[in-house]
Amino acid sequence: MENNAKDNQIMDSWEEGSGDKSSDISSALDIIEFILSTDSQENTADSNEVNTGNKRLSTTIYQLESKTTETSKENSGSVNENRQLGASHERATETKNRNVNQETIQGGNRGRSSSDSRAEIMVTRGISRSSPDPNNGTQIQESIDYNEVGEMDKDSAKREMRQSKDVPVKVSRSDAIPPTKQDGNGDDGRSMESISTFDSGYTSIVTAATLDDEEELLMKNTRPKRYQSTPQEDDKGIKKGVGKPEDTNKQSPILDYELNSKGSKRNQKTLKISTTTGESTRPQSGSQGKRITSWNILNSESGSRTESTSQNSQIPTSGKSNTVGPGRTTLESRIKTQKTDGKEREDTEESTRFTERAITLLQNLGVIQSAAKLDLYQDKRVVCVANVLNNADTASKIDFLAGLMIGVSMDHDTKLNQIQNEILSLKTDLKKMDESHRRLIENQKEQLSLITSLISNLKIMTERGGKKDQPENSGRTPMIKTKAKEEKIKKVRFDPLMETQGIEKNIPDLYRSIEKTPENDIQIKSDINRSNDESNATRLVPKRTSNTMRSLIIIINNSNLSSRAKQSYINELKLCKSDEEVSELMDMFNEDVSSQ
């Protein structure tokens, strides 16, 4: 701060002496000492600064031929206070081809400068120089055909003194103030990076300001603002300072920017540049900061406006400037068309990729059967999907697909619920069928058991057979007979005279003929004879058939039943295991014999 104050004192003494036609030796020595100290500070700042990419505002100003002329009047609303250092009087210059290369000024910390920082611009001609300013931490680059001079004044008290003495020169409004912002730093458009003017073929000496000049300046500064948005990517190379120089035929988009002044002091402080002071403020991020990257100083005599065409701030292009006149709108429209075509091409490619992914998704969800074109389907749902994917933008497509997926999932949930209900109904039907089948099996088992019992009873009844006298061809006899009333047979008392009557029934067995003896009499007799011959030991061994059984067999054989019936009774008798079974069997035998 002390160095800045000292420098300001030297400049004030320099300006006070400039009014006189002659300058003493002391003032000249002060100027030389100031220049030497400035160069040493520049070398020190350059040695301390490595790979920072900062650009500094020059404090050394060179000037060429000058001619006395009136102050140029511009048709713009922004105002800069122009100052020429190192000369006896102030001069303003105008370039020959009216085109100035774009110059970039960036602060060391790119933060906002204090409210006391201020830009004073003087324009010279035919200088190509790049020199740093250690006090302000900025650097300016100038080409041979495009010249501009800037100075930073940080002392508020001395700035007020300068404002009372200096003449504010009207500077054309900017043709391009792109909203550049890097690393979250911004200066609200108060840092000026380049100024361009037209060349009138001569340089003019700035005369003293009058009240009429100030009133005219106020009237011009009260014009309405006009803003025109520009894309941020056009000035990326300018912000970074490493971009390649582009073709000068490409015109950068224009942002008309005018400062609306409030009072004479406000009008004199027309433009402030953000620089790094002793205490640099912290960079502020957001949408506030908009760096001024291109300025054009216009001549009042020519009604046309030009644009700055340089895209590289570190490598100034010399001798290749392009004036824009009536063909400006054509170039702007061409650039806009190119950008629009590029964006449309990107949007089209993105939309195509999105549509392909959407078709695959729809195929996986089951909305469509194959990945063919959606236009081939006649289903209303698919037609609706095709219309949305072909016409809507990406956001609408995303919303539509989200809704479609939700609808498909809900549809699937409904189908799942229906399937679950059908499965439950099938389960209940199967349970009913199982119950009926079980009942049927039980009934069949009962019927089978009943049939088997009936068959067993039938077998027992059929084994009895029929009467002997009954003819065989007469047919089947009933198994169950009902007892009818039978005539009672009177018992005849035995009379010995009955034997003489010749009735065989009345003849006793002992007197019967040998021919009518039973067949098994021989067997019986043989058994008796064998038993007599056996020893006493053999008699003690139990025999297979007892005497009772033998006698019963003899009785059955002597009956009047058929041979088949006799054999069946004998077989049943052999199977009997108890006396009760034998008695029951003999009762049945007696019934059969009595029934005949």
UniProtKB/Swiss-Prot annotation:
Annotated spans, L protein binding: 442-475
Main function: Essential cofactor of the RNA polymerase L that plays a central role in the transcription and replication by forming the polymerase complex with RNA polymerase L and recruiting L to the genomic N-RNA template for RNA synthesis. Also plays a central role in the encapsidation of nascent RNA chains by forming the encapsidation complex with the nucleocapsid protein N (N-P complex). Acts as a chaperone for newly synthesized free N protein, so-called N0, allowing encapsidation of nascent RNA chains during replication.
InterPro entries in the cross-refs: Paramyxo_PProtein_C, RNA_pol_Pprot-P_XD_paramyxovir
N0 binding: region residues: 33-41
Subunit structure, as described in the record: Homotetramer. Interacts (via multimerization domain) with polymerase L; this interaction forms the polymerase complex. Interacts (via N-terminus) with N0; this interaction allows P to chaperon N0 before encapsidation and form the N-P complex. Interacts (via C-terminus) with N-RNA template; this interaction positions the polymerase on the template.
Coiled coil location: 416-436
Region (Disordered): 1-25, 38-196, 220-352
Domain notes from UniProt: The N-terminus consists of a long intrinsically disordered tail. The central part contains the coiled-coil multimerization domain (PMD). Forms a four-stranded coiled coil structure. The C-terminus constitutes the alpha-helical domain that binds to the nucleocapsid (N-RNA complex).
Keyword terms: Coiled coil, Phosphoprotein, Viral RNA replication
Family: Belongs to the respirovirus P protein family.
Pfam assignment, any one: Paramyxo_P
Biased composition regions of type Polar residues, renumbered to the chain: 1-11, 38-66, 74-85, 127-144, 270-324
A GO term, aspect molecular function: RNA-directed RNA polymerase activity
Disulfide bond entries: none
Domain of life, source organism: Viruses
The keyword DNA-binding is assigned to this record: no
Organism: Bovine parainfluenza 3 virus (BPIV-3)
Region feature Multimerization, mapped onto this chain: 374-441
Record's compositionally biased regions (Basic and acidic residues): 88-97, 151-168, 233-249, 331-352
BP terms from Gene Ontology: DNA-templated transcription; viral genome replication
Name of the molecule in the record: Phosphoprotein
Keyword Cytoplasm in annotation: no
